[in-house]
Amino acid sequence: MSKFILKKINDFTYSLKMSGDNSIYLYNIIKKILQSCIFDNETNSIFFSAENVIPFKQYLLEQQNNKLSHSKCVKLIDDLSKQIFFLNKCNFGFYGFDIEDILTIDNTFIFCSTQNLLPLENDCIIFTSPINQPYFSNPELFKLTSLPFEINTKCCYYSLGALVVFSLLNTYLLVGNELKTSKEIDKIIEPLFNTKIYWFLKRCLDDDINNRKLLLV
């Protein structure tokens, strides 16, 4: 089942319909990012103007060697981090990501799925029912063995880091049902040493969730 429905109305106009009660928060993000957009209450859809809209998965396949350039990866980090912070202010948080969750709208990267989005209580995501493990997961989700269960919202920092590693290096941190170890991750990201992205990844892929930061400097 599709997480969202994207339709091309004409050459430069699109409609986007997302499912889930929490979709209004994602619509609000899109309205902040895209200047020319209108929300239609009757259809629970947003209409916007853009020259090019494609799924992020397809966008990656169109890049050289199926990888983002360093500059495009910086844009990915900046765009998605802003959306994470916005949702946190609204007391919502992602617990992980799937590549199908993201659209590329005129080279801007936008979350378009509420599947992995839950309310926050005291900066924690509360799990009261079973979930499907997102492909860009985090160590905390593997500890989810009983319900109810709570995880600090910073768990998604690791998931974003895993997405960035895949987008830039074409390498998954999740293999089967196991995440790479810290030593394995250090080896994977070693080619990025002394770049802004390298230190960003070191911060958000920290084993200790309390030490994780979304900071690109």
Question: What annotation goes with each model-predicted range?
Answer:
Residues 140-153:
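Conserved end of the kinase activation segment
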Residues 156:
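Conserved catalytic-loop aspartate of Hanks-type protein kinases
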Residues 81-93:
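Protein kinase catalytic-loop region centered on the HRD/HxD motif
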Residues 203-216:
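A conserved short helix/loop substructure at the end of the activation segment
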Residues 94-136:
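Activation segment/activation loop of eukaryotic-type protein kinase catalytic domains
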Residues 76-77:
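Activation segment signature within eukaryotic-like protein kinase domains
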Residues 29-71:
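Conserved structural core of kinase catalytic domains
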Residues 159-171:
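Short, conserved alpha-helix in the C-lobe of eukaryotic-like protein kinase catalytic domains
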